[in-house]
Structures are given as C-alpha cells and as structure tokens.
C-alpha cells in the first residue's frame, strides 16, 4: 500500500509505503452440540520490527436447537503508520488543524474477550431471535491525539501512545418476523470506554485530565422495520439512537478549551 500526499499550502508531505506479508491458519472441530475453533495469523509489517502473532479462539455450545452459547478470544494490532483520517485538514474555531505522528509512536495492541447467547423461537407464523452479548477489550499503548501547539499558523495534533485503555459492556439485539411480510429488528449497546490513566488533550492550562474516551457514547442503539404489502413493494423504517458523549470544545466561541458532554440524539 503506497500513500503520498502533499499539502502544498501547509508545508506537509506524507510519503509512506506499507508492506504486509501474512500467514493464516486455523482448525475447527464441531458436532451438533460443540464447536471449537483455534487459529492464528502471523504478520510481518515493514514498519514494525519482528513478527507479530495474533491468536484467536472460539468455543460454541448448543444445548438444544434453539439455544446457542459462544465464547471467543482474539488479539489484534494497529501499526504506527499514517491512516486516511490523518490526511484530513480540519477547521477548528476558524483555525486550521492537522495531525502528525509522534516520532516514537509504538504499535497499539488489543486483546478481546466476548460471551454471547442466541435464543430462537417460533410461534406459528412468527419467528423470533434474541441475542445477549458481553464484551471486554484491553488496549496496550493505545493511540490518542493531543494538541501540542501552533506551527506556521496551523494547530498541530500529535498521535502518540497512552499507557492503555479498557472497553467493556454488553449488547442486546432482538428480531421478530411474521411470515415474509413483517420484520422488526432492534439493538442496544451499553459500554464503558476509559483510559487506564487520566490524560489531557491539550497543553493549554485549565484543561482537566480525564480517563473517559472522546466521542464514545456509553449508550447507543438502532431500530429497523420493514413491511412487504405485495411481492414487489417494501416499506422500511430505520432509526438510530446515540447517547451523550464527551467531546473537545475548542476556544473561539468560548474563551478557552474545555471538555463538554453532548446531549443524546436520535
């Protein structure tokens, strides 16, 4: 993957070549009640010293045809490289801001565990499904942005490593269908996203050190419904809910930088 970007007016040139060679293997054993999957991927990334091994495992148990339990584990990483969003040039309170990578940016690593239960049921012409899931992710050397000041009139945000973060919570999803006419599906997620150590997002005095991650609501969900009155016609209704979240409010309209909670919205 080759990425080259020249922002002529802002004295920024991005010239990056990414080469990844991967080897993937997995083995699965299953019968009607049990399923076990074990696998792993070996990656060689030209921006990372050495090889990275990413294991994964999945365990399934079906006590009956209508009940399905799962447990899974996975490991992942993000390389210290420029991503598409790093090329965006933002306007913050009338001031242009850009992202750059810290010189000593390290690999971000993650380990995730999840437990889930799927329940299925039929009542005549009706079918239903309920899924309950709990998840936990531990991030080491997690990427984060921090304002470090102005350079040639441009506000510089630097992507660097924090010590780590944890994300955990649960999902609840349900689906109900009547024949091939009506289908309703809804889901709700409650989660907690926190850095392991409090951090500030700006060097400006007065910005409080916090652990909560920005732009990560603790509650969000969705709803979708469809109705097929005739074979070639479908009526659809969709909606999403996003709970309150913490964001950075930059100086300009207000006197100084501060962190604020947004209202929830549909």
Set out the residue ranges of the language-model regions.
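Surface-exposed extracellular loop regions of Gram-negative outer-membrane beta-barrel proteins
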Residues: 14-56, 60, 176, 181-192
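Membrane-spanning beta-strand positions in outer-membrane beta-barrel proteins
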Residues: 35-37, 58, 62, 68-72, ...
